[in-house]
């Protein structure tokens, strides 16, 4: 069974700052330099999007980034090749932080369930987040993922009931992922003050019904929001704002420089 880098990290008494990045965005060849920049700038975990033509929970920035990734040749096989290179230090410094893949069921089914789990594990992936995999239907997938040493992360939303929060906490291998707003990522449709009025009680409710760690994502754009979320949870995920920060890069090295510059503002 492959070594999993997430579990030891969960035992550390620290708040986690997690980066979400769409491979080969905004230009082909950007992935490995950007991963190096994020690791060097203090990302504790890197979440890589698996681009899909019909995402259900992604806002327009991530949807657009996925289309760019697809145009630049990203598919599951090429993404796993990039992870292998990152782990081997081919084209960048050796990437040692945990890597979680986030994507949807259909491409994984098309690839082949056990083939995907085996190839992901061998490439150096540590965890999976599959938004459209219902926890109550995930027993077999969880068992197979565990046999390949892969951590599985499930989502909690503001409308998730306490009993289901407990179920998700029990099923998530190492940590769960709380959506800070009940909307698609990065849309920011709710006023920040309105969100803040509800989010503290929501995360307190999650805390009361979980034993494992949980992190918060969706709409976190700056250090102030990171600090606020980390005061209420075990970590924060920043994705849309990172993609926006590097959107104007014309070369891989420029994308890496922009990623590093932005990420350092969050710490």
Swiss-Prot record:
Q: Show the InterPro entries listed in the entry.
A: Aldolase_TIM (IPR013785), RibuloseP-bd_barrel (IPR011060), Trp_synthase_alpha_AS (IPR018204), Trp_synthase_suA (IPR002028)
Superkingdom field: Bacteria
- Pathway note: Amino-acid biosynthesis; L-tryptophan biosynthesis; L-tryptophan from chorismate: step 5/5
**SUPFAM superfamilies referenced in this protein's UniProt entry, alphabetically:** Ribulose-phoshate binding barrel (SSF51366)
Q: Which GO terms describe its cellular component?
A: cytosol
**Matching Pfam families:** Trp_syntA
Q: EC no.?
A: 4.2.1.20
Annotated TM spans: none
For this UniProt record, give its keywords in alphabetical order, as a comma-separated list: Amino-acid biosynthesis, Aromatic amino acid biosynthesis, Lyase, Tryptophan biosynthesis
Q: Which GO MF terms does the UniProt record name? A: tryptophan synthase activity
Q: Which reaction does it catalyse?
A: (1S,2R)-1-C-(indol-3-yl)glycerol 3-phosphate + L-serine = D-glyceraldehyde 3-phosphate + L-tryptophan + H2O
EC class, as a word, reads lyase
What does the record give as the active site? 47, 58
Note the subunit structure.
Answer: Tetramer of two alpha and two beta chains.
Q: Which family does it belong to?
A: Belongs to the TrpA family.
Q: What does this protein do?
A: The alpha subunit is responsible for the aldol cleavage of indoleglycerol phosphate to indole and glyceraldehyde 3-phosphate.
Entry protein name: Tryptophan synthase alpha chain
């Amino acid at each position: 069974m492959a070594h999993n880098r997430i579990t030891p990290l969960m035992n550390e008494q620290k708040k986690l700052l997690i980066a979400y990045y769409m491979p080969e965005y905004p230009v082909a060849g950007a992935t490995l330099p950007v991963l190096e920049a994020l690791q060097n700038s203090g990302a504790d975990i890197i979440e890589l999007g698996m681009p899909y033509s019909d995402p259900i929970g992604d806002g327009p920035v991530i949807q657009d980034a996925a289309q760019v990734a697809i145009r630049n040749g990203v598919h599951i096989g090429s993404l796993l090749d990039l992870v292998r290179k990152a782990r081997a230090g081919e084209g960048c410094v050796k990437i040692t932080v945990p890597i979680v893949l986030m994507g949807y069921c259909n491409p994984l089914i098309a690839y082949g369930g056990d083939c995907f789990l085996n190839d992901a594990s061998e490439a150096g992936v540590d965890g999976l987040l599959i938004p459209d995999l219902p926890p109550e239907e995930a027993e077999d997938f969880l068992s197979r993922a565990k046999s390949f040493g892969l951590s599985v992360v499930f989502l909690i939303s503001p409308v998730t009931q306490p009993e289901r929060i407990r179920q998700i906490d029990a099923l998530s291998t190492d940590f769960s992922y709380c959506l800070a707003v009940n909307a698609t990522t990065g849309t920011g449709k709710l006023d920040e003050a309105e969100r803040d009025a509800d989010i503290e009680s929501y995360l307190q409710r999650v805390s009361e019904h979980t034993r494992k760690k949980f992190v918060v994502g969706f709409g976190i754009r700056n250090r102030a929001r990171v600090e606020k979320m980390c005061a209420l949870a075990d970590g924060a995920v920043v994705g849309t704002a990172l993609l926006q920060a590097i959107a104007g890069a014309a070369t891989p090295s420029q994308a890496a420089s922009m990623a590093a510059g932005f990420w350092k503002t969050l710490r």
